[in-house]
Curated annotation (Swiss-Prot):
Species of origin: Felis catus (Cat)
UniProt main location, coarse: membrane
Residue window of motif Lysosomal targeting motif: 234-238
PROSITE patterns, alphabetized: TM4_1
Keyword check for Disulfide bond: no
Top-rank taxon: Eukaryota
Cellular component terms (Gene Ontology): cell surface; extracellular region; late endosome membrane; lysosomal membrane; melanosome; multivesicular body membrane; multivesicular body, internal vesicle; plasma membrane
Pfam (any one): Tetraspanin
Protein's name in the database: CD63 antigen
InterPro entries with a match to the protein in the record: CD63_LEL, Tetraspanin/Peripherin, Tetraspanin_animals, Tetraspanin_CS, Tetraspanin_EC2_sf
Biological process terms in GO annotation: cell migration; cell-matrix adhesion; endosome to melanosome transport; pigment granule maturation; positive regulation of integrin-mediated signaling pathway; positive regulation of receptor internalization; protein transport; regulation of vascular endothelial growth factor signaling pathway
Gene this protein is translated from: CD63
Extracellular side: 33-51, 103-202
Length: 238
């Protein structure tokens, strides 16, 4: 028995949402990978809220893509089991995204404190490790900052002369510009406030995006349930 306009419209909107979910899934994976690459150069990798968040985002994105595919198959074939599975898994993803959003908000200051701790540790290793030198120099050049709190932090590094800072602190970076420097020729602001603040704000953006996607997924769940009810009633929505 064919269903008139209303259910056909629901099925069409569900297809549109499934395409949107696929796009969101790809976006989440891209954001997660990008965040992971950034965090590799800013905070110590380990089981911390800051470093685990990108992994969760990537996993949610991959799972959302798979669930969207299941939903598409279920809608095309009007398969009751597939649509129920789609609705259940989409509900789980929505709950995870809400949890990610809450975690991002709760741990926003934790990300900044982790960065502060790690940046100071990297400063201690700066003269001894070429990889650390590369990471710290890139951060100081890109964010136009110097030291943790400010440029004077470099004076407390054992293997650094008190009369110099890394060349990456200079406004105009040239070899040896950090030796016997003049304050007006270097960036005085510390990196913790600049980079940590940038990380904190981006965590909040990701949290807000997760809530936005979760809201759209609620619509997907509603439409899926409507289609499930129609299929269970023995209707055929062409």
């Amino acid at each position: 028995m064919a269903v008139e306009g209303g259910m056909k419209c629901v099925k069409f909107l569900l297809y549109v949402l499934l395409l949107a979910f696929c796009a969101c899934a790809v976006g989440l994976i891209a954001v997660g990978v990008g965040a992971q690459l950034v965090l590799r150069q800013t905070i110590v990798q380990g089981a911390t809220p800051g470093s685990l968040l990108p992994v969760v985002i990537i996993a949610v994105g991959a799972f959302l893509f798979l669930v969207a595919f299941v939903g598409c198959c279920g809608a095309c074939k009007e398969n009751y089991c597939l649509m129920v599975t789609f609705a259940i898994f989409l509900s789980l993803i929505m709950l995870v995204e809400v949890a990610v959003a809450i975690a991002g908000y709760v741990f926003r200051d934790k990300v900044m404190s982790e960065f502060n701790k790690d940046f100071r540790q990297q400063m201690q290793n700066y003269p001894k490790n070429n990889h650390t030198v590369s990471i710290v120099d890139r951060m100081q050049e890109d964010f136009k900052c110097c030291g943790a709190a400010n440029y004077t932090d470099w004076g407390s590094i054992p293997l650094m002369s008190k009369a110099r800072v890394p060349d990456s602190c200079c406004v105009n970076v040239t070899q040896g510009c950090g030796i016997s420097f003049k304050v007006k020729e270097i960036h005085e602001e510390g990196c913790v406030e600049k980079i940590g603040g940038w990380l904190r704000s981006n965590v909040l953006v990701v949290a807000a995006a997760a809530l936005g996607i979760a809201f759209v997924e609620v619509l997907g769940i509603i439409f899926a349930c409507c289609l499930v009810k129609s299929i269970r009633s023995g209707y055929e929505v062409m």
